[in-house]
Amino acid sequence: MNRKGRRKTEKVYVKVNSDFDATGYMQPRQITWGDGRTYPIEQVRDFRPANTIADMPGDCYTVMIKGQERYLFFERSDPRFPSRFGRWFVEVETK
């Protein structure tokens, strides 16, 4: 644990297939890890600014994967690079 009492984690960037609805809402559908493992997202249970969960800018989706609740983060890109909208990551516990 770190000084704030939180478990030590690191960002692991993942590929996420998403849909956008007519209002512009981004709905993540599937996660693919770097080694090729793919997991469908069964349900999006919540969506909020990430700083309500962790001290970071961006968005946090609470999703169900294989019956377990997980956090999936969307990190917005620097506005100086308009062709890059952002990227997805999960937090993985470290020792």
Segments from the language model and where they lie:
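Cysteine-centric segments in proteins
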Residues: 1-95
